[in-house]
């Protein structure tokens, strides 16, 4: 049971915020895995094209997420200051900003889809490129819908209600799976069917959560969407937090693409092993990632209330819980490695690599990952976004990308090189964020402008 000496959030409040977040991330990941398996039944070209486009889509989604994060922090601080009117005004500007940005990104990707894919993935087979172009066109149409849904879900979390986004997300994911079953296996529409199913599920999620936001009696109530007009002072506050976060997230996704291109140089058995390791390692991170998302709301509310010491207290508490979850999920996933490798049909060589690397990850990760990724959310919630951006982007490119290239291309470390670089990246972040957190400069920062 969560115990806290803070006054803004009881243990029950924290459980109500965090448990649905954990459930949502796990469910979404499971549905994403099922989605990939279903598309794979269409053929290698289809699953390869979808995989390539998803790598680009993730970069775009990070841009929308960054704007939503900026809005979450601003709204959470308004709510902490007991200014519900300010929080509702800011929420309207978050929706407007994300809608415009996501619509422009979607239009650009639709018009330039061939140029974008040719630039990022130059040497793919024509069948893969054709599948990717089809998938990119349809999924780009969904950008405004997934952007608005993400912003609306973030606003619910800022208000301390993560249960509704969880339920809407679950419904959308189930619709996507059902749509895949119909479009892929009944109508046999191939990649077009997979993209259409994804887009329709995102439209539904967006429509449902906007309808829910209109209900009176909630902390944040949104209605008359077409009457929303820009409030540049609020938009500036949101983007002051959102832009550095967007740069940080964008650099992270680009760095992942660079690492993927380096891994592609390895033998087939190691590439297959690395794909499985990535999936399993992600599952060990999800509960702690949910803790980090919740901490943005918790620390933001504390800072808005003028109680930085409570923000510090909750950050330490939730980092400890993040540590515990990393240990528990790591052990559980490691115990499942052999059965998963057997069921997935991995070769013996690939399976041996997966078992060895997951043991190493299970041992190393608890020492560095929680400190690398949990306290940084409190820094962002306090407005210390530039420091977070510089540390994260610098560590990603210097250690995860450059060190990975050196270890694999020049020293022949194989998959082990990927994870050595990853561990060094995590350790570097942990050191910088711990120092920043302990020194306390973030506790004296402000997101809300004085005249608000």
List each language-model region with its residue ranges.
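Transmembrane helical elements of multi-pass membrane transporters/channels
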Residues: 16-35, 138, 172, 201-205, ...
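Hydrophobic alpha-helical segments of membrane proteins
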Residues: 26, 30, 103, 107, ...
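Small-residue-rich hydrophobic transmembrane alpha-helices
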Residues: 47-107, 149-165, 271-337, 369-392
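Small-residue hotspots at the loop-to-helix junctions and early N-terminal turns
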Residues: 44-55, 132, 136, 195, ...
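Short runs within selected transmembrane alpha-helices of multi-pass transporters and secretion channels
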Residues: 68, 138-157, 165-173, 194-209, ...
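N-terminal transmembrane alpha-helices
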Residues: 5-37, 41-42, 58-70, 74, ...
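Short alpha-helical transmembrane segments in multi-pass integral membrane proteins
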Residues: 1-21, 75-142, 186-243, 299-365, ...
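Helix-terminus/linker motif at the lipid-water interface of multi-pass membrane proteins
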Residues: 26-48, 117-126, 182-191, 250-283, ...
């Amino acid at each position: 049971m969560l115990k806290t000496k803070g006054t803004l959030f009881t243990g029950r409040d924290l459980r109500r915020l965090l448990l649905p977040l954990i459930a949502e991330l796990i469910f979404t990941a499971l549905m994403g895995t099922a989605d990939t398996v279903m598309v794979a039944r269409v053929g290698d070209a289809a699953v390869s094209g979808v995989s390539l486009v998803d790598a680009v889509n993730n970069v775009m989604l990070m841009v929308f997420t960054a704007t939503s994060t900026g809005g979450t922090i601003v709204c959470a601080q308004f709510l902490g200051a007991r200014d519900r009117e300010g929080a509702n005004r800011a929420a309207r500007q978050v929706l407007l900003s994300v809608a415009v940005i996501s619509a422009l990104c979607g239009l650009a990707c639709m018009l330039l889809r061939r140029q974008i894919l040719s630039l990022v993935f130059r040497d793919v087979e024509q069948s893969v490129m054709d599948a990717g172009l089809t998938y990119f066109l349809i999924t780009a149409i969904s950008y405004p819908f997934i952007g608005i849904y993400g912003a609306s879900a973030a606003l619910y979390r800022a208000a301390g209600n993560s249960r509704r986004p969880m339920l809407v997300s679950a419904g959308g994911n189930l619709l996507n799976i059902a749509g895949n079953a119909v479009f892929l296996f009944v109508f046999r529409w191939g990649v077009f069917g997979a993209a259409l199913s994804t887009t329709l599920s995102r439209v539904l999620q967006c429509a449902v959560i906007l309808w829910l936001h209109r209900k009176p009696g909630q902390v944040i109530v949104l209605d008359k969407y077409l009457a929303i007009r820009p409030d540049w002072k609020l938009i500036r506050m949101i983007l002051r937090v959102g832009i550095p976060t967007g740069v940080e997230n964008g650099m992270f996704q680009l760095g992942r693409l660079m690492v993927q291109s380096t891994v592609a140089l390895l033998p087939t058995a190691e590439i297959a092993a690395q794909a499985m390791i990535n999936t399993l390692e992600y599952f060990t991170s999800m509960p702690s990632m949910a803790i980090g998302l919740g901490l943005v709301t918790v620390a933001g509310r504390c800072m808005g209330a003028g109680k930085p010491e409570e923000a510090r207290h909750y950050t330490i508490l939730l980092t400890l819980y993040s540590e515990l979850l990393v240990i528990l999920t790591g052990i559980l996933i490691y115990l499942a490695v052999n059965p998963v490798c057997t069921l997935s049909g991995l070769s013996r060589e690939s399976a041996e690599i997966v078992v060895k690397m997951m043991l190493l990850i299970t041992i190393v990760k608890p020492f560095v990952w929680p400190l690398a990724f949990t306290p940084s959310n409190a820094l962002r919630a306090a407005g210390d976004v530039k420091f977070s951006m510089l540390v994260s982007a610098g560590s990603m490119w210097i250690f995860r990308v450059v060190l990975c290239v050196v270890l694999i291309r020049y020293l022949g470390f194989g998959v082990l090189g990927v994870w050595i670089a990853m561990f060094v990246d995590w350790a570097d972040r942990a050191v910088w964020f711990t120092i920043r957190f302990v020194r306390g400069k973030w506790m004296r920062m402000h997101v809300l402008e004085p005249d608000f």
